[in-house]
Amino acid sequence: MEQTKIDRINELARKKKTEGLTGAEKLEQERLREEYIEGYRRSIRHHIEGLKIVDEEGNDITPAKLKEIQRQKGIHGRKPEDNS
């Protein structure tokens, strides 16, 4: 998310505390917050999907559900036709 939008979120939050928001400003704040949260979720999801969990012996112990997502996206050399 662009810094100008984050600044606007903060500006609206400050205004809400001091003098209140108009109806249009409330809608704008809600829209900007949703956009921010969606971007945050995408970032976290992308980070988690990139994880590979390895035990002390070097064995891949990544959960099956995560491996399947990685197979679909071709992450960590996993290919859709791989079964392990």
Swiss-Prot record:
Gene Ontology cellular component annotations, sorted alphabetically: cytoplasm
Subcellular location: Cytoplasm
N-terminal signal peptide: none
Start and end residues of each stretch annotated as Disordered: 57-84
Alphabetical UniProt keywords: Cytoplasm
Transmembrane segments annotated in the record for this chain: none
Origin superkingdom: Bacteria
One family name in Pfam for this protein: DUF896
Family per record: Belongs to the UPF0291 family.
Protein name: UPF0291 protein SMU_447
